[in-house]
Swiss-Prot record:
It catalyses: (2R)-2-phosphoglycerate = phosphoenolpyruvate + H2O. Its EC number is 4.2.1.11. The gene is eno. It comes from Ruegeria pomeroyi (strain ATCC 700808 / DSM 15171 / DSS-3). CDD domains: enolase (cd03313). Gene3D superfamilies: Enolase-like C-terminal domain, Enolase-like, N-terminal domain. This is Enolase. It is an enzyme of class 4 (lyase).
């Protein structure tokens, strides 16, 4: 009855108005699982390949009809007849069918869409929510959100070099309380920016994108908004950054064009250390470029004892890249993006490897999202303890927060909010 009888993909639009892949998997008893694939703007060089058509006459070359055809053709032919509960075997079959190291033939967007839709169908077939089906009875930890309230870098049309300025409500009693705290700070920040004559337009991930160039000015606005909302920075709510440093790493230097600075690797470490000394920052993502291993080691040696140093472009949710980072002593946390590696099985393998090495995990969205809230379930399933899914605006972001609220309600008394347990040092 849990046999796959049909797999169908279609081209839909993501939150940036770009095409992406959506997949339906239908089982013999009529159960159907559906998944939509996200897409990133600042992408790591080592990510699995997202297949785009390149036909400039459609969607400026960003169409995904070839990936859709791969699902409806080769992949469907391979997987129809499989038992949907055999996730590992199904993912392995698709990886073998693709035959490349980076899923470049069929496309990671094709493979991932099927992988997640299969998991959803199997969860429904077994009458379990997705977080329980994937995570088992131990899945009960609700993650602390990293709420991106000021956008810069590749996510906004402004001169801010650092890509994301985030708040983390560690003092919340539960996820519902955390969302409320974040929303209150978000709305307070809007008033502060407006009062300063700055734009309150939002970026790709729902955060504000004001026309300011200084990292410290952005941080000051966030601190002031936390305080005016009635909370204490560094006690109730902490700060987190996503530098996306690979985006401004040019010819061996870190070029902060918004601030008019060009820094060596060591100087960039000093720059970040000074921010940590002056602000209640507990997490920095991609503080160094993806190939600057020496810089990552220096940053980890300098700040790793007290700050979570998250590898996104560095690790790309890839067990091989993560293993190298662990061996080199670089970073102490991994950002988890299912589309970077391209299958649920490989994602879970990377998460487990990070856990075993005492690295933390942060479940993450992409800047190009849909209403699909799968990552909320996966955050709980893997007991990540942290989730990064944008600001308190745009329904593509709020879909994940709302799903976490539902999951917490369903878990009842066994639900645990990670809260202060994520703090280091």
């Amino acid at each position: 009855m849990s046999t796959i009888i049909d797999i169908h993909a279609r081209e839909i639009l993501d939150s940036r108005g770009n095409p992406t892949v959506e997949v339906d998997v239908v089982l013999e008893d009529g159960t159907m699982g559906r998944a939509a694939v996200p897409s990133g703007a600042s992408t790591g060089a080592y990510e699995a390949v997202e297949r785009r058509d390149g036909d400039k006459s459609r969607y400026m070359g960003k169409g995904v009809l070839e990936a859709v055809a791969a699902v409806n053709g080769e992949i469907a032919e391979e997987l129809v007849g499989f038992d949907a509960t055999e996730q590992v075997a199904i993912d392995a079959a698709m990886i073998e069918l693709d035959g490349t190291e980076n899923k470049g033939r069929l496309g990671a967007n094709a493979i991932l869409g099927v992988s997640l839709a299969v998991a959803k169908a199997a969860a429904d077939f077994t009458a379990q929510p997705l977080y329980r089906y994937v995570g088992g009875t131990s899945a009960r930890v609700l993650p602390v959100p990293m709420m991106n309230i000021i956008n810069g870098g590749e996510h906004a049309d402004n001169p801010i070099d650092i890509q994301e300025f985030m708040i983390m409500p560690v003092a919340a009693e539960d996820i519902r309380d955390a969302v409320r705290m974040g929303a209150e700070v978000f709305h307070t920040l809007k008033k502060e920016l407006s009062a300063a004559g700055l734009s309150t337009g939002i970026g790709d991930e729902g955060g504000f994108a004001p026309n300011i160039a200084s990292t410290r000015e952005a941080l000051d606005f966030v601190l002031k908004s936390i305080e005016k909302a009635g909370y204490k920075p560094g006690e109730d709510i902490y700060l987190a950054l996503d530098c996306a440093a690979t985006e401004y790493f040019k010819d061996g230097k870190y070029v902060l064009s918004g601030e008019g600075k060009t820094l060596s690797s060591d100087e960039n470490v000093d720059y970040l250390a000074a921010l940590v000394a002056d602000y209640p920052i507990i997490s920095i993502e991609d503080g160094m470029a993806e190939d600057d291993w020496a810089g990552w080691k220096a940053l980890t040696d300098r700040l790793g004892g007290k700050v979570q140093l998250v590898g996104d472009d560095l690790f790309v949710t890839n067990p091989a890249r993560l293993a190298e980072g662990i061996t080199r002593g670089c970073a102490n946390s991994m950002l988890v993006k299912v589309n970077q590696i391209g299958s649920l099985t490989e994602t879970l393998k990377a998460v487990d490897m990070a856990h075993r090495a005492r690295y933390t995990n942060v479940m993450s969205h992409r800047s190009g999202e849909t209403e699909d809230a799968t990552i909320a379930d996966l955050a709980v399933a893997t007991n990540c303890g942290q989730i990064k899914t944008g600001s308190l605006a745009r329904s593509d972001r709020l879909a994940k927060y709302n799903q976490l609220i539902r999951i917490e309600e369903a878990l009842g008394e066994v639900a645990e909010y990670a809260g202060r347990s994520i703090l280091r040092g």
